[in-house]
């Protein structure tokens, strides 16, 4: 996986400038649409914000931007590991954010398929591989790869941002005990509410 640290965006996050984070990430991505770092981080920040706001208030502008990025990612960046990973992950967790014509279950399956493809195509990446381990084999695999997963989190997600904290937490859950994703999203919602 490429380095996804984005210092300018991370600084805005540290300063808790939510609207600036949203605007800066999207506008920078729009100026260089094939930049993978910009795409992954701008896509994630929108997904995260919408997950946080889900059920509280609608933000059609950000919803539309996320769907526009989704369409672009599918049509222009689909075979790029980091894009397929972030889109597959977000679709698996919240397919409702991407649905049209009530195709919720289809999108959830597509997210699983994308993550499975990423796992198969990246056998040397312990984190990405973890998304392709069958459930019945996962506990044994997790125990055998615990140290590698923890090191992966340190190597790839040790910068100061919501993105980094979120995925480092996910990696630690994969290394230790599996935690319900919904409960972590509730934590994210609490953080965003405090802003």
Predicted features and spans:
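Solenoid-repeat scaffolds in large eukaryotic assemblies
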Residues: 18-22, 111, 141-149
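N-terminal alpha-helical scaffold/docking segments in eukaryotic complex subunits
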Residues: 1-34, 38, 195
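Solenoid-like repeat scaffolds
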Residues: 26-34, 74-79, 116-121, 150-158
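Helix-turn-helix repeat elements of alpha-solenoid scaffolds
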Residues: 11-25, 57-69, 103-109
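Amphipathic alpha-helical repeat scaffolds of TPR domains
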Residues: 1-7, 31-55, 78-97, 123-137, ...
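Residues in the short coil linking paired helices within alpha-helical repeat scaffolds
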Residues: 17, 96, 107, 137-141
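Short secondary-structure subsegments characteristic of cysteine-rich extracellular domains
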Residues: 103-122
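Long, ordered, amphipathic alpha-helical scaffolds
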Residues: 130-195
């Amino acid at each position: 996986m490429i380095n996804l640290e984005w210092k300018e965006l991370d600084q805005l996050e540290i300063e808790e400038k939510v609207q600036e984070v949203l605007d800066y990430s999207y506008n920078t991505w729009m100026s260089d649409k094939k930049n993978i770092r910009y795409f992954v981080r701008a896509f994630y920040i929108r997904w995260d914000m919408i997950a946080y706001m889900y059920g509280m208030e609608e933000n059609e502008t950000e919803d539309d931007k996320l769907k526009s990025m989704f369409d672009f990612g599918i049509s222009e960046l689909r075979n790029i590991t980091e894009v397929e990973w972030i889109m597959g992950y977000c679709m698996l967790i919240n397919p409702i954010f991407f649905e049209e014509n009530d195709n919720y279950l289809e999108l959830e399956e597509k997210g699983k398929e994308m993550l499975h493809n990423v796992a198969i195509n990246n056998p040397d990446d312990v984190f990405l591989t973890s998304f392709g381990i069958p459930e019945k084999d996962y506990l044994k695999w997790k125990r055998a790869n615990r140290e590698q997963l923890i090191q992966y989190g340190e190597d790839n997600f040790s910068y100061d941002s919501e993105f980094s904290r979120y995925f480092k937490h996910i990696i630690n859950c994969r290394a230790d005990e599996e935690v319900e994703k919904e409960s972590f999203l509730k934590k994210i919602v609490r953080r965003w509410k405090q802003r």
